[in-house]
Amino acid sequence: SSHDVKMTPQNRTIFFGMDQGSAELNSSNIKGKNPFADKRVRLAMYHALDMDAIQDKVMRGQSVPAGIITAPGVNGHTAERDQRLPYDPELSKKLLAEAGYPDGFELTLDCPNDRYINDEAICVAAIGMFAKIGVTVNLDAKTKSQHFSEVKEGDANGMTSDMYMLGWGVPTFDS
């Protein structure tokens, strides 16, 4: 009998989460308010990411930039919604200025270093991209056991992680 071996892409989406609900970010130099509470700041961070560069240089062509969290092949995925907005660092700077952060701000990114393919390398690349828009991001890369316990645990004031990397995959292909 002959065997037909098929290689298919993983249906995992890697993303950065941002604490939007806390009154103040724990690691930020901005006190008394939370930059991520402003949609313009979150959009600025999004437009700062050159996903084609990450796909090419970090992932060596073995990834597909996603516009939504649901991967192709998963029930609920729609191709027309799975379109990324463009990489646009100038727009990012404009959005930050409009939100009241013309000089950017500083914070920490929590990243696993042993969970996803090239996880820490993706975080390092993103940090360089955020720097180009004036946002200083300090990397806190840890093993997955430390990373996940810190990201999921909050306190009375909200989350303890200001910005973090996570992945979402659906082995059942049903969102």
Regions found by a protein language model. Name each.
Residues 2-8, 17-39, 73-91, 101, ...:
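Short, solvent-exposed loop/beta-turn-alpha elements that line the ligand-binding surface or hinge
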Residues 40, 44, 49, 53, ...:
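Extracytoplasmic/secreted proteins, especially bacterial periplasmic and envelope-associated proteins
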Residues 64-98, 113-120:
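Structural transition elements
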Residues 62, 74, 167-170:
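Glycine-rich beta-alpha junction loops
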Residues 1-6, 109, 122, 128-175:
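Periplasmic binding protein-like
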Residues 5, 64-65, 103, 137:
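Residue-level detector of short coil/turn "hinge" positions at structural boundaries
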